[in-house]
UniProtKB/Swiss-Prot annotation:
Active site: 192
Designated name of the protein: Probable 3-hydroxyisobutyrate dehydrogenase, mitochondrial
Single GO BP term: valine catabolic process
An example Gene Ontology CC term for this record: mitochondrion
EC top class named in words: oxidoreductase
Amino acid sequence: MFSSKKSLLLFKNVRYMSTSSSKTVGFIGLGNMGGHQAINLIKKGHNLIVFDMSKDNMNRLKEKGAKIANSPAEVAKEADVIVTMLPASAHVKNVYCGENGIFQTVRPGTLLLDSSTIDPATAREVASIAKKHQSTMLDCPVSGGTGGAEAGTLTFMVGGSEQDFNTAKTYLECMGKNIVHCGDVGTGQVAKVCNNLVLGISMIAVSEAMNLGVKQGMDPKKLAGIFNTSSARCWTSELYNPCPGVIETSPASRGYTGGFGSALMTKDLGLAVDSAKSIGEPLLLGNSAHQLYTLLVAKGDGQKDFSVVYDFLNKNFKNSN
């Protein structure tokens, strides 16, 4: 006879062996990132059932062919695979563990892929609860911004076993280009926290340098061009420049609307600060970056793209000459 552990493994494998097109994929969290990810899953032929707090967001997916659910629990009743893209740890806990949450109705063998950016401890905690419900959860945070989400070129940083990672790739490759196995559950979030620490600091550095050059008479496009062909070259300068007019398609050129909100960057830098404290590591630039973005949020720029730090520096520190 099979042991209960072997029986569960066999059951999971039988579910995973069926063709992906026959599976129902649930998607919860249809904001600036998740909405595009869900659409790309539909484009790749997957049947979707979706939930979001915004009816407008759900209706946009309904127009693309998705089925609408009334709660995360309703999604879990029907889905073989569930992807979540939520703002913070508290939202993840509520969607999975709360009233009408996923764990109320999740079926044994369900694959759970959380693309939210949260602290590694919460990722491990919720994955442990998922295991008690005979389902498998991987942390799969992303990088690439709304442009990458729309184009299907996101980088996924995945924490989980090698076997579960290989299963998840079938779905993640519908939404991204670079799918990286980081290690055990929680390491995807570790990688994402470190990535966004660099992103936040580099945005401040590029903004400060652009502001310094422009206020001394440099043409912003020429200055950015020098950065992008010299040792200052980085993603922030080359593809997401914070100075209006340098890149016509960037949030900076449309009043810092859309993109990745300053409030979310503040949250992510806070995760880095907390992570460093938990292991007794100093975070000199990270702490300063977190304080600056906290100030931006306090002055009302939380919903503006995080490149608005350039606008803050430009307007608040006038050239005294």
